[in-house]
């Protein structure tokens, strides 16, 4: 995996269930966590994506999401998935603009999916 190490710090952990990554912008503008769970061989789950408030609207979230896609593709995954709280409708719309769609509706969350192939 080739990622600009001057711009991002990447930490990975291997677990009995798979591997997870934490990707942090070195300038502190944002962080994302992704999981590769062996029980879901085609899917990369985005555990959380956060951008500090004063950096929002500057492409930080998009760049972190693009890194998730890059890693997922390199790992041979077919889908990216994530959950969005129902009380954050603006995030649902943002992820839709990034190519995700609502796959299922849970009690308090929307499960969203993006096809990578």
Model features per residue range: what roles?
Residues 62, 74, 86-104:
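Conserved active-site alpha-helix within GNAT-family acetyltransferase domains
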Residues 1-47, 52, 71, 103-107:
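Acetyl-CoA-dependent GNAT
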Residues 72-83:
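Conserved GNAT acetyl-CoA-binding A-motif
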Residues 37-39, 54, 87-89, 117:
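Short coil/turn motifs at secondary-structure junctions
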Residues 97, 101, 105-117:
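Terminal substrate-recognition subdomain of acyl/acetyltransferases
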Residues 81-92, 108-113:
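Conserved beta-strand-loop-alpha-helix junction that forms the acyl-donor binding cleft
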Residues 51, 57-70, 97:
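Conserved acetyl-CoA-binding loop-helix of GNAT-fold acetyltransferases
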Residues 58, 62, 90, 114-117:
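Accessory recognition modules or surfaces
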């Amino acid at each position: 995996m080739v990622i600009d190490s001057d711009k991002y710090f990447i930490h990975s952990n291997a677990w009995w269930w798979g591997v997870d990554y934490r990707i942090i912008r070195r300038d502190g503008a944002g962080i994302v966590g992704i999981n590769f769970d062996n029980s879901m061989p085609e899917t990369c789950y985005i555990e959380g994506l956060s951008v500090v408030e004063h950096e929002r609207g500057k492409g930080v979230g998009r760049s972190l999401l693009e890194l998730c896609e890059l890693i997922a593709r390199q790992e041979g995954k077919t889908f990216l998935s994530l959950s969005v709280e129902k009380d954050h409708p603006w995030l649902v719309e943002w992820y839709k603009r990034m190519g995700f769609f609502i796959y299922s509706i849970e009690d308090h969350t929307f499960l969203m999916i993006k096809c990578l192939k």
